[in-house]
């Protein structure tokens, strides 16, 4: 596991807005971890560590929360922030079982310049996300679609998108059009 995805945490037993303010005053962020098969866990994380890594995270970044003994596989569910003060007030993490497949919508990243567009065609993007299924640690943050070979009159469907080996398409209709060039 990439060390940039590991966040250290400490458990906390005290709650409420007064205690949350004290935690933030100590350069930490109050947070909560919950999931379908786990109890709610109240934690605090170092503000500097989270802020340094937060800019690189997406909705599909799998993080490992660790207290030195227990590791939890999580996604960021919600971040409460004060934009004027540039402070993160609270983070909600959603825990998943790293041994079970999950379904997620991941971004489609379009790269290259389409031959059809160079010939005067118009590129119409109809979908920017794709539903996939995989183990959490195998989940890509996005998939790339190379537009270079797409000619005028061509279309790209979900089944045309190349996914990593351990990732499966989970769309109901694999023939749905993602983009086309007219």
Swiss-Prot record:
One of its GO terms (cellular component) is cytosolic large ribosomal subunit. Pfam families: Ribosomal_L25p, Ribosomal_TL5_C. The keyword Signal does not apply. One of its GO terms (biological process) is translation. Keywords: Ribonucleoprotein, Ribosomal protein, RNA-binding, rRNA-binding. GO terms for molecular function: 5S rRNA binding; structural constituent of ribosome. The keyword Ribonucleoprotein applies. NCBIfam families: bL25_bact_ctc (TIGR00731), PRK05618.3-1 (NF004135). HAMAP family: Ribosomal_bL25_CTC. PANTHER family: RIBOSOMAL PROTEIN L25/GLN-TRNA SYNTHETASE, ANTI-CODON-BINDING DOMAIN-CONTAINING PROTEIN (PTHR33284), RIBOSOMAL PROTEIN L25_GLN-TRNA SYNTHETASE, ANTI-CODON-BINDING DOMAIN-CONTAINING PROTEIN (PTHR33284:SF1). This is one of the proteins that binds to the 5S RNA in the ribosome where it forms part of the central protuberance. Part of the 50S ribosomal subunit; part of the 5S rRNA/L5/L18/L25 subcomplex. Contacts the 5S rRNA. Binds to the 5S rRNA independently of L5 and L18. Belongs to the bacterial ribosomal protein bL25 family. CTC subfamily. This is Large ribosomal subunit protein bL25.
């Amino acid at each position: 596991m990439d060390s940039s995805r590991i966040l250290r945490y400490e458990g906390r037993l005290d709650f409420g807005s007064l205690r949350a303010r004290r935690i933030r005053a100590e350069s930490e962020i109050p947070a909560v971890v919950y999931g379908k098969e786990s109890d709610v866990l109240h934690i605090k994380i170092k503000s500097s560590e989270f802020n340094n890594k937060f800019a690189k995270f997406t909705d599909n970044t799998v993080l490992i929360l660790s207290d030195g003994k227990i590791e939890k596989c999580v996604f960021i569910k919600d971040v409460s922030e004060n934009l004027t003060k540039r402070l993160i007030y609270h983070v909600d993490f959603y825990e998943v079982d790293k041994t079970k497949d999950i379904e997620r919508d991941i971004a489609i990243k379009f790269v290259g310049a389409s031959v059809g567009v160079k010939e005067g065609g118009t590129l119409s993007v109809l979908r920017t996300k794709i539903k996939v299924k995989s183990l959490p640690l195998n989940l890509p943050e996005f998939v790339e679609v190379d537009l270079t070979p797409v000619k005028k009159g061509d279309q790209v469907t979900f089944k045309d998108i190349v996914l990593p080996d351990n990732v499966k398409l989970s769309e109901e209709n694999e023939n749905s059009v993602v983009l086309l060039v007219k």
